């Protein structure tokens, strides 16, 4: 299967494209965002990596500027290293991730990447004989380590890194202040927020949600482009964040701890910590 078959995209205007993996039919299917700038293009999250995303972008003509001068530099940023977001980083020359998860990416740690994929989720295998049990996130050396407050410049567009741990220890959002757009990764999406994985932390998540609410209160976000499911606006962002905070009491922390223990055992059985096998 070619990259052109595996991926599909939808233009959203203002140089932003929404890309998905067509034959990965799962709640874990991550949204991939392409943001085009005057000097650099940016991919936010990279999917599973079963087919080359850069090949798709080139074949679909998404990297060629209007003047036909040739492709601009391309940077791939992972909002966190979970497998559905980081598997495709292997196909990029320039890769950025938050420093808290850089070591996991470098060693191909499929425990921290929470790699969990089944044959039934991949409705059309990328090649004959492919099996989900052979899938892993390979080691990738990041070319840039991100920190809170870093700015990724695309020339005519600036994206500010917000370190928002909770879902994972290195989770980030990218904030386009000028256009009031938040690329939220898995920090928040229109669904149940997951805080029971290895390296999740409820207390950190509460603080991150408070920051999300502050963005809305200050009028700094109008549109959220999340890591999963559909886009939504500021009012929904505020409600999702406030709802999480309201439920994050002692009972929730206890139940989350139990779920994390179960998830950790399951992930240890399917993935060797610190390896990509």
From Swiss-Prot:
The keyword S-adenosyl-L-methionine does not apply. It catalyses: hexadecanoyl-CoA + H2O = hexadecanoate + CoA + H(+); dodecanoyl-CoA + H2O = dodecanoate + CoA + H(+); tetradecanoyl-CoA + H2O = tetradecanoate + CoA + H(+); octadecanoyl-CoA + H2O = octadecanoate + CoA + H(+). Binds 2 Zn(2+) ions per subunit. GO terms for biological process: fatty acid metabolic process. One of its GO terms (cellular component) is plasma membrane. Its cofactor is Zn(2+). Zn(2+) 1 binds at residues 80, 82, 167, 186. Its EC number is 3.1.2.2, 3.5.2.6. The keyword Metal-binding applies. GO terms for molecular function: beta-lactamase activity; long-chain fatty acyl-CoA hydrolase activity; metal ion binding. PANTHER family: ACYL-COENZYME A THIOESTERASE MBLAC2, METALLO-BETA-LACTAMASE DOMAIN-CONTAINING. Acyl-CoA thioesterases are a group of enzymes that catalyze the hydrolysis of acyl-CoAs to the free fatty acid and coenzyme A (CoASH), providing the potential to regulate intracellular levels of acyl-CoAs, free fatty acids and CoASH. Has an acyl-CoA thioesterase activity towards the long chain fatty acyl-CoA thioester palmitoyl-CoA (hexadecanoyl-CoA; C16:0-CoA). Displays a substrate preference for fatty acyl-CoAs with chain-lengths C12-C18. This is Acyl-coenzyme A thioesterase MBLAC2. The gene is MBLAC2.
């Amino acid at each position: 299967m070619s990259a052109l078959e595996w991926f599909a995209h939808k233009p959203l205007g203002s140089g932003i494209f929404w890309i998905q993996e067509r034959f990965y039919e799962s709640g874990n299917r991550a949204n991939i965002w392409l943001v085009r700038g005057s000097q650099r293009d940016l991919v936010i999250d990279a999917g599973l990596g079963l087919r080359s995303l850069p090949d798709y972008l080139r074949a679909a003509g998404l990297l060629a500027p209007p003047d036909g001068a040739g492709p601009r530099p391309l940077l791939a940023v992972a909002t966190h290293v979970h497998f559905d977001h980081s598997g495709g980083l292997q196909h990029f020359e320039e890769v950025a991730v938050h420093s808290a998860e850089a070591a996991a990416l470098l060693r191909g740690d499929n425990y921290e990447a929470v790699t969990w994929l089944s044959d039934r989720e991949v409705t059309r295998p990328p090649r004959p004989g492919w099996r989900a049990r052979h899938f892993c996130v390979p080691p990738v050396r990041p070319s840039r380590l991100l920190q809170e407050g870093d700015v990724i410049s695309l020339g005519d567009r600036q994206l500010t890194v917000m370190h928002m741990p909770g879902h994972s220890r290195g989770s980030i959002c990218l904030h386009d202040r000028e256009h009031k757009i938040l690329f939220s990764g898995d920090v928040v999406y229109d669904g149940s927020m997951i805080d029971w994985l290895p390296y999740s932390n409820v207390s950190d998540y509460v603080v991150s949600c408070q920051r999300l609410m502050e963005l809305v209160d200050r009028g700094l976000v109008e549109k959220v482009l999340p890591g999963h499911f559909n886009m939504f606006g500021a009012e929904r962002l505020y409600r999702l964040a406030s709802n999480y905070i309201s439920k994050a009491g002692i009972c929730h922390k206890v139940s989350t701890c139990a779920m994390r223990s179960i998830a950790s055992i399951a992930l240890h059985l399917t993935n060797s910590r610190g390896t990509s096998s």
